[in-house]
C-alpha cells in the first residue's frame, strides 16, 4: 500500500497524500491501519525523499529462488531500480511479474476473444448506421456475450478449481483495474478543469469497473433537447479529446506506476473509447443508474439504458411492467414533478379500480411445495389455497407457476382472519380466480408498496422529491416510511 501510494504521488505530482489515498488508491488496498493512521500527517511531501525510509521485503516463487535475488530493499528507489534492471512489472497488490517471458496463456486467450468481439461490434455498428435496429440488437447481444466470456477469464483465476488458479494473480488483476480506472478519473477531471478554465470542479459523475461517466456542463452550452447529428458530433468531439488525452496518459501510468517499461499499442490491452453520449441521467447509487443516450459510437441513436435497475422483473405483473419505464422516460425527458406525480397517481388508481385481481397478482414459481424448510410468502399462500380453496386434488398447488396477492380480510373464513393470514397463491390459470374473487378483500396498501412505491421511491429520493399526498394519505406502509427519510442524491445531467 505504501509503495502504490508513493508511486501515485510521484506520477501525478501530488504533494497531498490524503487526496491520493482517498481518490486514487484502490479501495482494495485501504486496509493498512498504520497507513490510515499516518495519512493525515503526510502532507506537502518531498518527491526526492519520498520512499527513502521504506523497507521492502521480497518473497520469491520457486522458479526464482535460486537466482540470487535480493530479499530486502532499503528504499523505494532501490526497489524501482531493481525492477527496471530486470525488466520486471509491479502490480498494485505487490506481485512482481517477469516481462522477459513470452505472452502468457491467459493474455493470449483474452487477445483472441477480443478480436472476435471486434468483428461483432463492427457488424453491430454497420447495422446501426443503416438504421436496422433489429439486427443491431442481435449483434449487440453477441458482442456483449463475448465481453462476458472475456471478463470470466479474469475471474476464473480466483477459482481454486481452475487449473491455473492463482489468487495473487487474481488480486493483481483486480487492483490493477481499480488503480487504472481511478487514475483515469483523476486525469479526466484535471483535463476537463483545464478546458473549462475551472479549478477542482468534479466533472466525473461516477466510474465503474471499466467505464467513466462525466459531464460536459460549462464546456458545451447546447440545449439538452438537441438532436441535430452535427451538433452531437461536435459535442462528442470533446469526449474524444478527453479519451485521447487519457489514453496517452495510460502509457505514462504503466511505465511509472507498474514499470511496464515496454508499453506500446501492440502490448497494451487497455484503451478508453467513447461509447455513448447522453443528454440526461439519474444516479441512484453505486452501479445503479439510468441514462437516456442520444449518440452511440458516432451514430445518432436514442435509447433508455438502465444499469442496476430492473424495469421489467419477471416477478412484476405483466400489466404493470410498462409503468416504471414510463416514469423513468418522463424523468429523463425533464418532465415536471407534477407530471410525474400524475403518472404515479393514475397507476395507483388503476391498480385499485381498473385492474382485476389476476392482473396485479405477483407471478412466481413453486418447486415441490413440501420441500421448503422455511415458508416463503408464495408457499404460505399456496398452502392456504390447498387447504381452503382447492376444490379437488387436481386443483392443488405442488409445482408450477402461481400468482400471489396480499389479503386484508377473508370475507367468509373466520379462522384465516383469526390466524392473521395475509396472502393467497393461485395456480396460474384464469379459471381459478373465480374461486376467490368474492372471498377476499385485497390489501391494496401492501400491493401499492410492492408494485409502485418500492420501485419509484429511489427515483423520488434521488430527485429530492416527496411522494404526492394523494397517494400517501391513505397508505401506512413503505410510502410513509419513505416520507420520513432524508433524500440525498439528485438528478445529474450528462
Model-predicted segments: where are they?
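DNA-dependent DNA polymerase catalytic subunits
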Residues: 1-109, 128-138, 142-146, 166, ...
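Non-transmembrane amphipathic alpha-helical segments
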Residues: 113-127, 146
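A residue-level signal for conserved active-site and pocket-lining positions in enzyme catalytic cores
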Residues: 117, 150, 478
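C-terminal reverse transcriptase regions that engage the nucleic-acid substrate
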Residues: 148-152, 156
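A generic structural motif
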Residues: 210-214
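Inter-lobe coupling/hinge region of RecA-like P-loop helicase motors
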Residues: 159-172
